[in-house]
Each structure stands twice: as structure tokens, then as C-alpha cells.
Amino acid sequence: QAAPDEGRASGHKLTVYWGAEDDTTTLDDVCNDSSYDVVNLAFLSHFFSAGGYPKMSIGNLDGPSQAQKKAGATGLQDGSSLVKSIKNCQSKGKPVILSMGGATDYSDVQLNSDAQGQQIANTVWNLFLGGTDHKELRPFGDVKLDGVDLDNETNDGTGYLAMTKQFKANFQKDTSKKYYITAAPQCPYPDQSEPLDVCQLLDWVQVQFYNNGNCNIAQRGFAKAVKNWSKGIGSGVQLYIGALASGADGDEGYVHAATLNRAVNQVKAMNLPNFGGAMLWEAHSAVKNGQLPEED
């Protein structure tokens, strides 16, 4: 039970990453679990890959479709096997968000200019969200994902503000649905990879309170980091407490359920104006480790 069981009724939510690990936990498993409110698909790992298109690294998908191959976009994946599951999730009111980035050993989401940032926002808009260019290349066909999550861990935020503004402008073009833009910065405050001027424009920020020593959950600097992040992103942006669902992958800072519940209660007691809930990395390890949250 790695997440708080109380308080969800008052609007506190649980987001979870899925796709980067072993696929024995399916997207349907995650979407059908009432504990989870939002799924982050991990990952769109490279902004510029074969043919100038992005590269996807979603674990249980195969290679590119015929149309993608023909266009030279061989870093894209044929996501048709996930379409039904994504629709299932969305039908339950659970947004499915494309997370872009990940650990730097496996990704490259560095930008060298504002123009590149705007270009990526347009490319991703067309391939995954409400855009209509490159229809034949869309990994999930006519399914529109619900937004993007910025998981830049390069320590270089160049172009991210321009990209974020372009995403938000694109979102306005499709009034048929609500789109979200979020980020997952590291807990040392502030984070160069996800600059504050970017975070202040987002719907929520799910801070990784792990892999970072002093500001990890239950460490000495945790409370101060939470307060700094809450204030820095502004009261209009929700703050989620990011936690590991297991210590199995060599990640550092995993805490047992009771400790995480204590930490979340500690945050609740701060009465922050923008506390939104918790985030878990990662769905497969949560199941494997028996770390699913308690039901309300």
C-alpha cells in the first residue's frame, strides 16, 4: 500500500507510470484498478530520431507500422495493440498522458533552441494529440491521448518554455476535449531540467522525491523541498508527491507503505493550497511488490 488511502474523496489523486517495464502488468490492469486516476505512458524517449521523427520506447509495443517505415519514421511504434486499452482508460475518466524523456541513459529530449521546442510541440500534437497532419503515422490511430508529461533529466531546459507555450496554444485548437501538460522534476529545488517558468504553466507537477538523497521522502530535506516546490510552481498548479513503488530497479529512496502514508499525511498537514496527490513509479513494480494503494 504505497499510497494514501484517505483523502482521495477530497480530490487527491494518484498518477502512475506504465510502459517502461515488464509488460506482465497490462494497461488494462492499471486502468481497471480503481486506485489509479491518471496513467503516464512511458516513454517517448527521443525527440529527434529516424527521419527526423521522435522515437518511442513503450515496452510492449513492436516496431514501426508499414506507413511509419515508408516515411522513414522507424523510431515510432505501431501502437494499435494498445488502442482498445487506452479507450478503456479514457472511458473511465482516466487521462492517458504521453511522458517524454526518462533516464538520460535511455533518452534524449534535449533541445537546442526555442524553434526546436515549437517544432516538437507541433509534431507530438499531430502524432498523438488533436492534430491532423501525418494522420497515417499516428501510433494510436484516431485515439487522442490526453496530454504530455515532461520528464527531462538532462539538466538543460533550453527550449522547454517555448515548447510548453506551443503545446498550450495547440490545445486551444481542439475544444472537443481537455488536454493536460505536466512535468516530473527531481526534488532538489529548483530543477534546471524543468525550469520554474515552465512549471508555472502546467496543470500539475509530480516531483520525484527519490533518487536525490536529502530531499527524498522521509529524509531531512523532504519537508522543505515540498514547501519550496509548492510555493515555486504557484497556487494554480497542483503538486504531486512522487514515490517509488519498489526498490527493485536500483532506484534509491524507496520507502515502505507506512512511511509513505506518513509523508503524505505530513504534506496534508502543511495545508498547501495546491497539494494534488501522489505519483508512483512504476505500475509493474507496484503490482509485483504488492504496493497498490489501499482502496477508499
Swiss-Prot record:
PROSITE patterns: GH18_1 (PS01095), GH18_2 (PS51910). Belongs to the glycosyl hydrolase 18 family. Chitinase class III subfamily. The active site is at E153 (proton donor). Its main location: secreted. It catalyses: Random endo-hydrolysis of N-acetyl-beta-D-glucosaminide (1->4)-beta-linkages in chitin and chitodextrins. Secreted chitinase involved in the degradation of chitin, a component of the cell walls of fungi and exoskeletal elements of some animals (including worms and arthropods). Participates in the infection process and directly acts in the penetration process of the host cuticle. Involved in heat-shock adaptation. One of its GO terms (molecular function) is chitin binding. Optimum pH is 4.5-5.0. Its EC number is 3.2.1.14. Residues 12-296 form the GH18 domain. One of its GO terms (cellular component) is extracellular region. This is Endochitinase 3. Disruption phenotype: Leads to decreased endochitinase and exochitinase activities following heat-shock treatment. Induction: Induced by chitin and cuticle and repressed by glucose. Protein expression is increased after host tick Boophilus microplus infection. Also accumulates in response to heat-shock stress conditions. The gene is chi3. Optimum temperature is 40-45 degrees Celsius. One of its GO terms (biological process) is polysaccharide catabolic process. Glycans are attached at N32, N152, N228.
